């Protein structure tokens, strides 16, 4: 193993821990170091707490750090990975579909809201232009019609869950650990949808560095799948003590090796975005995606 000062440095801007778990495990277990890389986070999860619903999209922590060059990579939902590269000034690529396969679930404590059709004209709190937003539109537009899908802008998932628990909103979309926490607290699921994310990377990373990084991340996935609850505390830490690691359900997140973002999947996502005014549609797969 090369000394740290001789290894290429890869800085990761943090997303939610449920999405970052393979990176966390890869660092913790020394997998990146053994692959010849010096991988670390460019900020803490506490730093992410400063993001708010009012903050412009490209001023959010991970986007801002990547765009200014303080981070070499971050993950975000599939649709947002396209959006952020189109909005950003730095340039970059989508190198893979991320290892985390997670659900967004629409939760409520309101007995009047039981199935997706009950959400016609009912605001669902999401974080704008993130997985919670895109999947909520997808879950509801076939049930109630696009004109009856109502989106309420909220902040990070813990903020949305607090709003739900305080009855400041009737329905929210969240991922783990807030799905498990919501069920523990007596909320119910109205709808849920699994989705992948995109790994946004700097154009400065070489193909060899990318391969070493994702090979190590895939090893981390294997370790997570072999002993999920050894690492579950990293996810439940997001709930600030309200959920024990063993209370985290296995049903709403799993992990697999990263995949190439092929043109068919890209075009389906991109066409969906264009049809809803979520992209001007000026990009091509070959311009945004590397493999």
Where are these regions (language model features)?
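Short linear loop/turn motifs
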Residues: 38-50, 248-257, 283-291
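Short, glycine-/small- and polar/acidic-enriched structural segments
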Residues: 4-144, 151, 170, 190-192
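Periplasmic-binding protein-like
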Residues: 13, 18-21, 98-109, 183-217, ...
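Structured segments of extracytoplasmic/periplasmic soluble domains
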Residues: 29, 65, 84, 122, ...
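C-terminal segment of N-terminal export signals and the immediately downstream linker at the start
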Residues: 2-4, 208
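Solvent-exposed, acidic/flexible segments
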Residues: 12, 16, 59, 99, ...
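Pocket-lining segment of extracytoplasmic ligand-binding domains
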Residues: 151-238
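Secondary-structure end/capping motifs
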Residues: 207-280
């Amino acid at each position: 193993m090369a000394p740290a000062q001789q290894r290429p440095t890869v800085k990761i801007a943090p997303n939610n821990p449920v999405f970052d778990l393979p990176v966390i495990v890869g660092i913790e277990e020394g997998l990146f170091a053994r692959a010849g890389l010096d991988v670390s986070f460019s900020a803490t999860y506490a730093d992410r707490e400063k993001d708010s619903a009012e903050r412009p999209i490209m001023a959010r922590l991970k986007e801002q750090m990547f765009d200014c060059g303080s981070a070499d990579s971050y993950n975000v939902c599939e649709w947002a990975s396209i959006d952020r590269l189109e909005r950003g000034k730095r340039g970059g690529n989508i190198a893979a579909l991320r290892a985390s396969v997670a659900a967004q679930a629409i939760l409520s404590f309101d007995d009047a809201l039981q199935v997706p059709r009950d959400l016609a004209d009912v605001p669902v709190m999401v974080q704008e232009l993130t997985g919670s937003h895109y999947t909520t539109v997808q879950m509801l537009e076939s049930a109630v019609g696009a004109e009856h899908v109502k989106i309420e802008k909220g902040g990070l998932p813990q903020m949305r869950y607090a709003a739900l628990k305080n009855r400041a909103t009737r329905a929210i979309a969240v991922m783990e650990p807030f799905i498990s926490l919501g069920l523990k607290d007596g909320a119910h699921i109205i709808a849920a949808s699994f989705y992948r994310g995109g790994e946004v990377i700097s154009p400065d990373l070489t193909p060899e560095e990318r391969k070493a990084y994702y090979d190590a991340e895939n090893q981390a996935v294997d370790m997570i799948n072999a002993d999920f609850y050894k690492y579950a505390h990293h996810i439940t830490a997001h709930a600030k003590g309200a959920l024990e690691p063993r209370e985290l359900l296995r049903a709403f997140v799993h992990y697999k090796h990263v995949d190439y973002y092929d043109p068919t999947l890209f075009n389906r996502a991109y066409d969906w975005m264009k049809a809803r005014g979520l992209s001007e549609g000026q990009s091509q797969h070959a311009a945004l995606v590397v493999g």
